[in-house]
Amino acid sequence: MAADAFLLIFGLLLTVLIVAQPLGSGLARLIEGETGTLLQKFEAGTARLFALDTTEMRWQQYAAAILTLNLIGIVVLFVLLMAQGVLPLNPENMPGLSWHLALNTAISFVTNTNWQAYSGENTLSYLSQMVGLTVQNFLAAASGIAVAFALIRAFSRRCVDTLGNAWLDLFRITLYVLLPLSLLLALFFVSQGVLQNLLPYQHLTTLDGAAQTLPMGPVASQEAIKLLGTNGGGFFGANSAHPFENPTALSNIVQMLAILLIPTALCFAFGKAVSDNRQGHALLWAMGLIFIVAAAVVMKMEVIGNPHLLALGADSAANLEGKETRFGVLTSSLYAVVTTATSTGAVNAMHDSFTALGGMVPMWLMQIGEVVFGGVGSGLYGMLLFVLLTVFIAGLMIGRSPEYLGKKIEVYEMKMTALAILIPPALVLLGTALALSTEAGRSGILNPGAHGFSEVLYAVSSAANNNGSAFAGLSVNTPFYNVLLAVAMLLGRFAVMVPVLAIAGSLVVKKRQPESKGSLSTRSPLFIGMLIAIVLLIGALTFIPALALGPVAEHLQFGLTH
């Protein structure tokens, strides 16, 4: 079993690294605007057609463009979901959503969270899935990558006050990266048996005479960008545990590869853009080491499972509850780590059915800010926030002015860094406290005790960190939870994104000082270790009390009561 786990983890990471390197080179060229003469003419013609100003933007203009696009997306998707009952491509006559569910869903998909308080097959029309959710999957992913591009340019440029053009970045990312990769991945999924049609649901009679309904729909096209864009929202309620979304062991492995591909490629792109590949490698080492330990712990906990089952005559104590037998314990555990280390939130097993400590690790990966690979764009800029914090602390320790890649890190950058790092944990803890202190919040808890607390903590952690996965035992399709989680998703996305752009705007105007013998090396094993320690320390200081009341208490109760 240990050998199988080793092969799964390292085989996945090795494959991702091999595939991500050439993509990282392509992304680096996009960051520098190297698209070729023919494509530049096409971009100029498209800009004239839509009357877009392609001049370079300062950080305030860049942020305004991103926020405007996403605000329009929320409004359009909200209206579409409310009105889907009278719109076409609705063969099952799905009614419009309630205002609070439509608001929650619109904010969820625009913020790259894809939290779903509904099951798609009995709630949404094909039009809502295609024109509403799938389009936002592209735009949300492009928004995150664009902000990462802006921050990378802040380190690679010097003595200017612009970060690029948001509209041009969004256009290039969508057209040259997300669309081609999604098309290839969708075709692969169709070859594996994932649905892609506009047929009405199929009503059948089984051999024993029972009626059965098979949902149909354009699944593969949404599935591809759901994974590549680390969005995570499933076409069906069971998400990637559903055989129409994830039918084979091969499709399951490719899904994990797709989730990790762009976050990994962005680290390579960062190294190339700042003319020091080892800087990107250092980030990957930090992410990879945390990922390996997290995956090993979850696999170990799920394999140990419930030893008391052996006394009852079971063949194995491994925790198979809530898991697909076609994937097994190890692959399901690895998928859970992949989807929560990133901001994806797609699931091929029910996290609510994991063991107490096996479920705690995915929750903790979200709570540390999803900087272990993280979401497309957001993972890189989230980890760079921790890099700036580490550089600042290291500078205090050695008595030197902190700097990163030759740029001095001063008071303004640290204020924005602290703000961006502290907002998601504050949202998690305050949101959980509000849910547990009100009758509306407590009424949604279906399981008593420590596990019920864990379900609430997981839900708010998932929303505030834009993940979208859930401990499904919590009843969340209520006005209280739909509004609470919508606010958490909105602030967790944009209250981090704006300070990141503010940091970029402050750094891009600074000179890039040459590295000296006294400079702190930010690519050494020592710095990588410090970076990991800072990430773990922030997570520990913030969430250990809450985790002790939830999964840790549940684990101890299990041992004491059995």
From Swiss-Prot:
NCBIfam families xref list: kdpA
Membrane topology annotation: Multi-pass membrane protein
Annotated keywords: Cell inner membrane, Cell membrane, Ion transport, Membrane, Potassium, Potassium transport, Transmembrane, Transmembrane helix, Transport
UniProt function note: Part of the high-affinity ATP-driven potassium transport (or Kdp) system, which catalyzes the hydrolysis of ATP coupled with the electrogenic transport of potassium into the cytoplasm. This subunit binds the periplasmic potassium ions and delivers the ions to the membrane domain of KdpB through an intramembrane tunnel.
UniProt entry tagged with the keyword Membrane: yes
Subcellular location: Cell inner membrane
Source superkingdom: Bacteria
Family: Belongs to the KdpA family.
Entry's transmembrane regions: 5-25, 63-83, 132-152, 175-195, 250-270, 279-299, 327-347, 356-376, 379-399, 416-436, 483-503, 526-546
Gene Ontology terms, MF aspect: P-type potassium transmembrane transporter activity; potassium ion binding
Full protein name: Potassium-transporting ATPase potassium-binding subunit
Presence of the UniProt keyword Cell membrane in the record: yes
UniProt organism field: Pectobacterium carotovorum subsp. carotovorum (strain PC1)
A GO-annotated cellular component: plasma membrane
Assembly: The system is composed of three essential subunits: KdpA, KdpB and KdpC.
One Pfam family matching this protein: KdpA
